[in-house]
C-alpha cells in the first residue's frame, strides 16, 4: 500500500515537473513569438487636414469623435484562432500620440502586424477619406543623454464600471491630453502615449450583463460582481435563473427590487449595460517621458497623468496611474519600444472609452503644435499616361493612400502649354530643371530664358556631352565676346510690322505710360521701319538717335524704303519740322533709347546688325538656347528688354514656320522663368496660335499679382495645364477657383516644398485636380557635369560671340556715336505728348 501511494506521489511529481517544463517552454515560445510579432509591425503616421469649421459644425464634435470609435470597432475582426493564437497571442493594434525628442509637433500613429498593413491603411482611409496614412520608420522620443520616466494606467475599480467618455464630457478630451504634450521643449524633451489593444472576445460582456441583472434584483454592486464573477458554478447558476416554480417567485422579486432601486443604482446598471453593449479590448496604456534631467522627466509625466483625471467618474470608474522605477521601468520602456502587449498591464475598455482617450485630431482642437496635414491629397485621374505610353516628360509622382504613380505630360498635351506658379524656394526651379533635363536627353529643342541665372547654369551642367554643339549660350555678362541680338532683323513685310509693333510694346512696358505717348510711338515706328528697309543690311536700335540728327544718313536709307507712309514721314513731316522741335524730339527719344545705347554691354549686343544665332535654325533643328539674363548682373530693365526681344523673335520664328507642313515642324519647348518680365500683350496670340507652330511654353513665376490683368486673363484662358506650388493668401484665393472642390485656399497656402497641385491636359481633356510630388534630381542620381558646362560656355562664346573690339568699332561707324549732335532740350518726360 505504501509502495502504491509512493508510486502515485512520484507520478504526480513527474507530471508536475513535466507540466512546469512544458509551461516554461510555452512561455519561452510565447515570448519569442511576441518579440517576432513586435518586430513585424508596420507603423503609419496619420495626418488630417485642419479645416475651417463654422459655428453649427462645431456642435458636431461628438459625431466626429464617434468616427474613431467605429474605426476601433472594425479592428475587433482581427483575431488569431487555434494553437497559433494560444502561443503568440492575439494580434495587437497600437495607437500612439508622440512628440519626438527633436521637434515640437504632436504626431499621431497607428501600428499593426505587417501582414495586416494594407488592411489597416485601407480601413483608416475608409473612415477618414481626407487623411494621409503614410508608412514610416520608427521615431524616437528619447533624449540620448537624458533621463526617462514612465507610468502605466490601470482601472481604479473592476472593468464592469465605465469611465467618463467623450459622450458625457462637455469638451473634446483630447484638448487636455494634447495640451500636456504641447509644452515640451523643441530639443531634448520627448513624450508619448501608447495604447496597445487586443480584442477581448465576448465572455466579458456576458459577465457584465449578469452583474447588471443581479443588481436589478436588488443586490449591491459588490455582491453582484462577486456572484457573477465568482467562478464557473456561480456564473452558471446566475445564468440559469433557477428552475420550476422558483421562476415566478424570482420574477416577482425582480419587479419588487426594481421599484426599490436607488437612482444611483439605476444609473450604475445603465452604465454597466452601456459599456457591455459595445466591443471590448484588452488594453495597455503607457505614458512615457524623456528629458535632460530626472526632475523634468517626472514633471512631464505628471502632466500627462493629470490629463487622464478627466475620465474619472465619482461613482463609477477612473484611471489610476502606476508609476514604475528601476527594473520595472526598463521593462516598461522595452514593451513601449517594441509595442509588446502585456497581460500584467491589461485592462478592459470598450470602444467608446478607447476613442475618448485616443482619437485623431478634429478641426476644432485648439492645441498648438498638432501635426496637421498641411494640404489635402486627391487621387490622380485614372487616365494618367503610363510610363511606356507616348512621348512625354515626367513631372513628378502622385502619392495617394500609399500608392505612387508617375505623372507624365504627353507631347500633344504639352503643345497646350504649362503654367507654373509658386513662392520662391517651393520647388519651381527643381520642376523646371527636371523637365529640361528630360527634354535635352531626348534630343528635343529647348529654349530657356532665366532672369536669375541659376536655372541657366544648372541647365548647362545637364547637357550631355554629345549635344555640346547644339547649345547656344546667350550670356550678356560676357562682355569680351558679345553675342548680337537685333530686333530690327526681319524677313518680309509681315515680320517687319510685327517686330516694330513688339518693339513699341516693349518700350511701353519698360516705361510708365505717361512718358510713352502717341508721338513717341509715331516717331519710333517710322524710324524703325526705315532702319529695317534694307533686309541685307538692317539697322539697329542704337542707330535711332542718328536717324533723327543725320539727314545724309536718312537720305542714304530712303531709296530702300518702299512704304509711302514712311517716306512721307521723312520727306514731308520731318522736312517741315523746325530744328528746335527736332532737337526736342531727339531729347525725348534719347531719354528712352539712350539708357541702352549708353550702356556698353547693351550697346554691344543690340547694336550688332546681325544676331549671333539664328532662332529659326535653333527651332527647326532641335537645338538648345540658354539665355542667362541675370538681373543681378545686368539690371532689371536690361534683362527685361533682352528677354522680351528673345520672346518676340521666337514668336516670329515660330509663325514663319507656316512655310512647312505641321508634321515637319519640330516641337520646341520654351521655358520662361518670371515670364511676366518677358511678355507683352501679344502673349495671348502666342498661347493661342503658337501651338500650331509647335512652340510649346512652360511659364513660371512667383505670384499672380505680378501679372497685368490682360496677361493674367490670357494665361488662364489659354493654358492647358496648371501647376501650383505653395502660394500666398491672395493667390490661394484666386487659384482655389481653379482647383475646387478637391483643394481649398488653405491647401494651397500650406503645401510643403516640392509638393504641387496640378490640373493637367490629358489627351486633350482637362483632368480633375490632384497632388504631385516634384521629382528631385539629386535623389535620382542626377549629377551636374560642371566640367562640361564650362566647356559649353567656351564653345558657345567662340561660336556665336564676336570680339569686343571688332563689335565696338563697327557700332561706332554705323551709329556715328562719336559725332556731336545737338544738345537735347531740358524738358520733362512726356512733355512732347501734350
Question: What do these predicted ranges mean?
Answer:
Residues 188-225, 516-521, 525-560, 768-791:
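Charge-patterned, long linear interaction tracts outside catalytic cores
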Residues 307, 311-314, 348-349, 463, ...:
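Conserved ATP-driven motor cores of ASCE-family P-loop NTPases powering translocation/secretion/packaging/pilus
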Residues 397-403, 411-413, 418, 423-424, ...:
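P-loop NTPase motor domains
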